[in-house]
A protein has these predicted regions:
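Bacterial Sec-dependent N-terminal signal peptides
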Residues: 1-25
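A short glycine/serine-rich beta->alpha loop
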Residues: 46-52, 242-243, 358-359
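Residue-level preference for non-acidic, small/hydrophobic
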Residues: 40, 57-66, 135, 167, ...
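Conserved serine DD-peptidase/penicillin-binding transpeptidase domain
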Residues: 69-347, 462-463, 467-469
Length: 470
């Protein structure tokens, strides 16, 4: 009977693999693997060893590695310092923001986004009335390369490709609001948030009836110029599109100086950024206070629930500090690979270049990710934290529409990953007393994404139901 069941499953897998996508998608690639976490039986393994583009399920590797290495109590730390004496309310030197890689300073995900007012109040309480020197962003925690290898030029300038900086601000995201007129006219900029001194929007947008949002931004790292291109819907009073902030450290310093002035603290010097740990004129620094982020489990949940590239990349780059003095992507890759190699996973099936999955250069096997999911569920002391970071299919996050109105709605805890020609899901399925790990990766499909997702849903349901009916 068991042999018959396995033969049936093999036929079913081949059938679903060949009919997963519409007829126009003849060149699609599929991997599917499912494991019963109680028995350890991998009851489905369709092409599990092939290397495919994962898109955002890469974030599972980043967040799991961070939990394992950094731990539940980890927080990012930003230290506010001075390098001169405080005399009669005057700082005889510079005010320095020693960055710690925190991606959430001013984040809209937080209840209190006005952290600069908190900083200003503390400085005023200390007795500071005037700063003779500069306000400095010490961003030496990371190198000065904010973009991972493989990020495409057309993505740069857009909010989802925000760079990785030692000092970040407002999710490194700029919201630009336009007012559009009739078709063929150029929309007017009516709002920019946050306000950034020296920021310039080169507006090349055109209003077009029926366009919806066909707009994007173009811009280079460390530049305050963002070009808006494409089309937006005609005759809209408020139409907001998102760009990245080209120079977050300097944007934060500008906002801090404005906040200090409103609080009665003046400054004589300039704003500047140091990428080296020691300023050009070495002076002793005196810490005034440390500003802590939320703890890592909450950051991991934000990352996986919202599939936020910017947060994932900051976590990823921070991991490199396990072996490097300055955060960088090359060492981050090595740290991730070395960790999972130490746990017995085959890292020859792991080829990554970023921590979010934005680059198409990333490739790994469903088997590798499934093995990691099994480890996190059965061995890791961070099992519950990792599991609870995943959105629920049919209910929340990026999978709120997946498996809705099916027997697995509310019972599949999955991270999604999608880009052109790519649709992936990975995580856990919990039904009654059974718990499964699951990875499905589809590459090179053509045509309708919605139909592709429907086929994936049917395949998942079929394999789970078939296994439980044995």
């Amino acid at each position: 009977m068991n042999t018959i069941r396995r033969l049936f499953l093999l036929v079913a897998i081949v059938f679903y693999g060949n009919t997963l996508l519409p007829q126009s998608s003849a060149y699609q690639k599929l991997s599917l693997i499912m494991t019963d976490l109680e028995t350890g039986e991998t009851f489905v393994n369709k092409n599990g060893d092939q290397l495919l583009t994962p898109a955002s399920i890469t974030k599972l590797i980043t967040t799991a590695t961070a939990l394992e290495i950094l731990g539940d109590d980890f927080t990012f730390k930003t230290t506010v310092q001075i390098d001169g004496i405080l005399e009669n309310g005057i700082v005889r030197g510079n005010l320095i923001i020693k960055a710690g890689g925190d991606p959430l300073l001013g984040s809209h995900y937080l209840e209190n986004t006005n952290f600069l007012s908190t900083w200003s109040s503390i400085l005023k309480t200390i007795g500071i009335k005037h700063i003779e020197g500069d306000i400095v962003a010490d961003v030496s925690v990371f190198d000065n390369n904010p973009m991972p290898k493989g990020w495409c030029a057309p993505d740069l300038g857009n909010y989802y490709a925000a760079g990785v900086y030692g000092l970040s601000f407002c999710n490194n995201m700029l919201q630009v609001t336009f007012k559009s007129g009739k078709t063929g006219t150029r929309p007017k900029i009516v709002g920019i948030s946050p306000q950034i001194y020296g920021m310039k929007i080169d507006n090349r947008l055109i209003a077009k009836r029926g366009a919806g949002d066909c707009a994007s931004f173009v811009g280079e790292p460390y530049s305050n110029i963002r070009k808006a291109i494409g089309y937006i819907e005609a005759n809209k009073k408020n139409f907001t599109i998102k760009a990245d902030i080209g120079n977050p450290p300097m944007a934060l310093l500008g906002a801090l100086r404005d906040t200090l002035l409103r609080n009665g603290i003046t400054q004589s010097g300039t704003l500047r950024m140091d990428v080296e740990d020691v300023p050009s004129i070495e002076r002793i620094r005196y810490p005034l206070f440390i500003y802590y982020s939320m703890k890592l489990p909450d950051i991991v949940k934000l990352t996986n629930y919202h599939s936020n590239n910017m947060i994932a990349e900051h976590i990823f780059k921070y991991l490199s500090l396990q072996k490097a003095k300055q955060g960088n992507f090359k060492d981050a890759i090595e740290v991730v690979k070395e960790y999972w190699y130490s746990k017995g996973l085959d890292v020859s099936k792991l080829d990554i270049y970023d921590g979010s999955g934005l680059t198409k250069d990333n490739k790994f096997s469903a088997e590798f990710l499934n093995r990691m999911l099994i480890y996190m569920a059965k061995t890791s002391k961070h099992s519950d934290t990792f599991f609870n970071s995943l959105p629920v299919a049919g209910v929340s996050g990026t999978v709120r529409n997946l498996l809705r109105n099916t027997s697995l709605s509310g019972k599949a805890y999955l991270k999604s990953g999608s880009m052109s020609g790519v649709q992936c899901y990975a995580g856990y399925i919990v039904r009654d007393s059974k718990k499964y790990s699951m990875v499905v990766m589809v590459n090179d499909f053509r045509g309708n994404r919605h139909k592709t997702v429907q086929k994936i849903e049917k395949m998942i349901l079929h394999e789970i139901n078939q296994y439980e009916q044995q």
